[in-house]
Amino acid sequence: MASSTMALSSTAFAGKAVNVPSSSFGEARVTMRKTAAKAKPAAASGSPWYGPDRVLYLGPLSGEPPSYLTGEFPGDYGWDTAGLSADPETFAKNRELEVIHCRWAMLGALGCVFPELLARNGVKFGEAVWFKAGSQIFSEGGLDYLGNPSLIHAQSILAIWACQVVLMGAVEGYRIAGGPLGEVVDPLYPGGSFDPLGLADDPEAFGELKVKELKKGRLAMLSMFGFFVQAIVTGKGPLENLADHIADPVNNNAWAYATNFVPGK
């Protein structure tokens, strides 16, 4: 009897129907099913970014974090004064929104700075300042991508909009749906084709990369907000504003502009 019980508990029979001879259990039939626990985010063991002993937002001066912020997810510094993460479903949605916005902000910040950097080093663009570049599509000659007429030559804002919707919608749909075979478990970190360098192969390194992504992404979102404010206030790109500040920091800073700014002038 004991040996039969031990044999039935073996993982080799997980998920299979096991017929036991009637000589052992009468006319009994035992069905065993494998149940998988819900996967939890992997955290790097001994990492300072995860768990109850993780780094908090004010270091040793931080108060007790809310009970629902356990350090299970990357970027959790125990700070949620507004209680935005108290509801698990809202927390999951906000986590996804933050990661996606972080990635867009990092790409956006690079796209704002890099063309202006190239233009300041002799590369010819029709317009290198990020918030002015798009308006070139309304010019007589249209907009040449990278200033090269042999690349994409855009003359219709509606066509550009349609292409963006189709292309980005396809990529996002692919990510959210889990790929063509639905093999992606976590749409935030799909891996596979989205990780050609295999950066997620090591769980501990992957856990640290998640934290780095969020930290840099949060800075990028603040940077993009600053770029928008600069564009409204000074009408210049981020690198030109930086050059002006270095040349005359007393008269070219946020405080000076705030005290002298008159909207519409």
Swiss-Prot record:
Indicate which residues the UniProt annotation says bind chlorophyll a 2.
101
Alphabetically ordered keywords of this record: Acetylation, Chlorophyll, Chloroplast, Chromophore, Magnesium, Membrane, Metal-binding, Phosphoprotein, Photosynthesis, Photosystem I, Photosystem II, Plastid, Thylakoid, Transit peptide, Transmembrane, Transmembrane helix
Q: List residues binding chlorophyll b 4.
A: 164, 175
The record's cofactor note says:
Binds at least 14 chlorophylls (8 Chl-a and 6 Chl-b) and carotenoids such as lutein and neoxanthin.
Cite a single Pfam family from the UniProt record: Chloroa_b-bind
Query: What is its subcellular localisation?
Result: Plastid, Chloroplast thylakoid membrane
Fill in the transit peptide range: 1-32
Keyword Chloroplast attached: yes
The record lists chlorophyll b 3 as bound by: 156, 172
Presence of the UniProt keyword RNA-binding in the record? no
**Which GO-annotated molecular functions does the record name?**
chlorophyll binding; metal ion binding
Residues bound to chlorophyll b 2: 103, 152, 181
Residues binding chlorophyll b 1 are 57
Q: What does this protein do?
A: The light-harvesting complex (LHC) functions as a light receptor, it captures and delivers excitation energy to photosystems with which it is closely associated.
* Free-text comment about domains: The N-terminus of the protein extends into the stroma where it is involved with adhesion of granal membranes and post-translational modifications; both are believed to mediate the distribution of excitation energy between photosystems I and II.
What protein family is recorded?
Answer: Belongs to the light-harvesting chlorophyll a/b-binding (LHC) protein family.
Report quaternary structure and partners.
The LHC complex consists of chlorophyll a-b binding proteins.
Name-wise, this protein is Chlorophyll a-b binding protein, chloroplastic
Which species does this protein come from?
A: Zea mays
